[in-house]
């Protein structure tokens, strides 16, 4: 099973992709995670990606396409995978389709997690991270001590691309470049719209029901 998760920044794609990965035993491939790992390690890819991500812009196709094409050919992807954060444009979707065609495979379903803009801004601008990997939110998941991680006791920080002004720019970029991909998968007859406004557990149930109805 090969799935693509679509939706605006903050729609919960990463959370749901992780659950799908666990439930169906297929790898979760997140271009965002790949970029952040490289930024943290100070690699050349990380330096290139950071220039764009800090401004709320998409990393250029030539960088992203190569990473994904290489990743999906790895052994753990033989039974399928779930893509989160890619493809983001019609051009990327066409590159993915061609790469899969060469492997004798296709995208089975594209899940579009739909969340209103105001909820996206609230979700992202209130999110705080810890370098140990834990995530908190000033409204939905407050730490026991303000500004301190419950797990490791270190100071929390806000990602540059989660600051309110950058979130708004990310949404503009999404509508300019990424939203048209919804029509791309709709035209192929494999788009499934998911209400992303409930709590994550409820969204997971909606996705499970949709995949079951689609025969997965």
Each language-model region and where it sits:
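Glycine-rich phosphate-binding loop of ATP-dependent small-molecule kinases
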Residues: 1-216
């Amino acid at each position: 099973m090969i799935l693509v998760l679509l939706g605006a920044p903050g729609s919960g794609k990463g959370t749901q992709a992780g659950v799908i990965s666990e439930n169906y035993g297929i790898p979760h491939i997140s271009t965002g995670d790949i970029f952040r790992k490289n930024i943290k390690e100070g690699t050349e890819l990380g330096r290139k990606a950071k220039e764009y991500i800090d401004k709320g812009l998409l990393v250029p196709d030539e960088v992203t396409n190569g990473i994904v094409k290489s990743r999906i050919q790895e052994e753990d992807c033989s039974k399928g995978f779930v893509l989160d954060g890619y493809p983001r444009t019609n051009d990327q979707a066409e590159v993915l389709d061609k790469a899969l065609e060469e492997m004798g495979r296709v995208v089975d379903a594209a899940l579009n997690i739909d969340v209103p803009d105001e909820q996206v801004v609230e979700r992202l601008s209130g999110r705080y991270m810890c370098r140990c990997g834990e995530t908190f939110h000033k409204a939905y998941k407050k730490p026991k001590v303000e500004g301190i991680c419950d797990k490791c006791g270190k100071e929390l920080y806000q990602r540059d691309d989660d600051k309110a002004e950058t979130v708004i720019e990310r949404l503009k970029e999404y509508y300019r470049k990424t939203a048209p991909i919804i029509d791309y998968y709709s035209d192929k007859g494999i788009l499934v719209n998911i209400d992303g406004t409930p709590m994550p557990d409820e969204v997971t149930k909606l996705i499970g029901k949709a995949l079951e109805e689609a025969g997965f």
